[in-house]
Regions:
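Conserved glycine-rich cofactor-binding loop
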Residues: 11-12
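Conserved glycine-rich Rossmann-like NAD(P)H-binding loop of the short-chain dehydrogenase/reductase
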Residues: 27-41
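Substrate-binding pocket helix/loop in short-chain dehydrogenase/reductase
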Residues: 95-96, 100-108
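Active-site loop immediately N-terminal to the catalytic Tyr-X3-Lys motif
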Residues: 97, 145-151, 173-174
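Alpha-helical segment proximal to the catalytic Tyr-Lys
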Residues: 124, 169-173
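Residue(s) in the substrate-gating loop at a strand-loop-helix junction
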Residues: 140
Length: 187
């Protein structure tokens, strides 16, 4: 039986590239999208053409209950995930004095709360597998050094980095690793 990896935000961009690369490496993939279902289905089809299994889950990672319901139903139907790539995220860039409450809230809810909302419901099923597992958080250089016009985004990514470090300590004895990848600007 092949191991399955959930890749959030994998209908396009970095997430799509990660999902395809993991499929090429022999993993089955759960393709996730918030709204781009057609693009997510195309990614899933590309994965199937590589000889791997793929399915699509659609939910907004900033909505805790919806995220938990979708993930728990998927785990119930298909079993616990071997790994998760937390890639879903967004930016709402603006100089801090011009940053709106909504700009702050939506970025923190999606990026930082999304970490909790995705991982919390699937953590015990991953632990109960009693096998090694992997969690990779796609963060940003902005979470390490900050970036002009991205106070909200930098705060969210720095929060993920801190949470990932703490979770890595918690899960180390269970052979589940937690790491962050912090890219710079992406084309």
């Amino acid at each position: 039986m092949s191991e399955t990896i959930l890749v959030t935000g994998s209908s396009r961009g970095i997430g799509k590239a990660i999902a395809l690369r993991l499929a090429q490496s022999g993993f089955d993939i759960v393709v996730h999208c918030r709204s781009r279902i057609e693009e997510a289905e195309e990614v899933a089809q590309s994965i199937r053409e590589l000889g791997r299994q793929a399915r699509v889950l659609q939910f907004d990672v900033s909505h805790r209950n919806e995220t938990a319901e979708k993930l728990l139903a998927d785990v119930e139907s298909h079993g616990a995930y071997y790994g998760v790539v937390l890639n879903a995220g967004l930016t709402r860039d603006n100089a801090f004095p011009a940053l709106t409450d909504e700009d702050w809230d939506v970025v923190l809810r999606t990026n930082l709360d999304g970490f909790y909302n995705v991982l919390h419901p699937i953590m015990m099923p991953m632990i109960r597998r009693r096998k090694a597992g992997r969690i990779v958080c796609i963060t940003s250089v902005s979470g390490l050094i900050g970036n002009r016009g991205q106070v909200n985004y930098s705060a969210s990514k720095a929060g993920i980095i801190g949470a990932a470090k703490a979770l890595a300590v918690e899960l180390a004895k269970r052979k589940i690793t937690v790491n962050c990848v912090a890219p710079g600007l992406i084309d």
